[in-house]
A protein has these predicted regions:
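Active-site beta-alpha loop architecture of Rossmann-like, nucleotide-cofactor-dependent enzymes
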Residues: 21-25, 64, 107
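SDR active-site strand-loop-helix element
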Residues: 18-19, 56-62, 101-103
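Mid/C-terminal beta-alpha module of Rossmann-like enzyme folds, strongest
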Residues: 145-150, 154-196, 200-202, 231-232
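Glycine-rich NAD(P)-binding loop of the Rossmann-fold in SDR/ketoreductase-type enzymes
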Residues: 29-44, 78, 82, 86-89
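Amphipathic terminal alpha-helices
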Residues: 214-233
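Conserved Rossmann-fold NAD(P)-dependent oxidoreductase catalytic core, especially the SDR/UDP-sugar
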Residues: 43-79
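NAD(P)-dependent short-chain dehydrogenase/reductase
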Residues: 81, 93-136, 140-150
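NAD(P)H-binding glycine-rich loop region in Rossmannoid oxidoreductase-like domains
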Residues: 1-37
């Protein structure tokens, strides 16, 4: 394949797999494409990496669990029933040369506005809903990139499936904090009917690596200071 040829030609030490169909795009694709990208490709790539002595870092999602209240531990059995969650679950790799990180991320996009933060920024000065009972334990893309750098440098042998998680926060509170940090002038209406709780427990990863996840205020301060590139795209 072209991917295998590219890997053979470049001879990387580490491959970070960022290929995948996100949940917001699932309605515009079919199940075959979702399974090919989210389920099959990670295992094909992991096999190439294992044979070539290349480390692979792969991303899974909190959506391998249903949004039922309760803390989800890495030892718990995933129970997703939707195409996205199932396709990502099937794509989790666990080889001696790979690490799968279950997490969720918020950050900027180069194109479009499907993600939570990009959507909120695109709504500047308008009224939006804030979901009090949608509980989130993801990370900013800024912070995740720093963790990946540390994993590459300080934990070259770490393999397996782990969960990265921040302190739980409601989508209402998260959007409110983003509104304050970026001065979006949003009017946020409290919405309480929708319920979704995919709280991940990241204790095992934090204890193993001594990598602590900052508070949301600290992550958002860092995020707010990194806007100039995206504002000029």
């Amino acid at each position: 394949s072209t991917v295998e040829i590219a890997i053979r030609d470049t001879k990387p030490d580490v491959i970070i797999n960022c290929v995948g169909l996100i949940k917001q795009k699932m309605g515009t694709t079919n199940s075959v494409e979702a399974i090919q990208l989210n389920s099959l490709f990670p295992h094909q790539l992991a096999e190439i990496c294992l044979e070539s002595n290349i480390r692979m870092i792969h991303f899974s999602t909190d959506c391998v669990f249903q949004g039922i209240p309760g803390i989800k531990r890495v030892s718990d059995t995933p129970n997703a029933t939707d195409l996205y969650g199932l396709s990502k679950l099937l794509g989790e790799v666990n080889t001696p040369s790979s690490i799968t990180l279950r997490t969720s991320i918020v950050g900027r996009q180069l194109f479009g506005s499907e993600s939570l933060f990009e959507w909120a920024i695109s709504q500047r000065g308008t009224t939006v809903n804030g979901y009090k009972n949608a509980i989130y334990t993801g990370l900013t893309t800024n912070r995740l990139s720093q963790i990946i750098e540390k994993l590459i440098q300080d934990f070259p042998e770490l393999s397996g499936i782990y969960q990265l998680a921040s302190s739980p926060i409601s989508k209402f509170e998260l959007i409110s904090k983003l509104n304050d940090h970026l001065k979006l002038n949003l009017r946020i209406e409290l919405e309480t009917d929708f319920h979704c709780d995919r709280t991940l427990d990241g204790t095992e990863f934090s204890e193993l690596t001594n990598i602590d996840i900052p508070s949301w205020d600290d992550m958002l301060t860092e995020f707010a200071a990194d806007q100039s590139f995206y504002d000029n795209v």
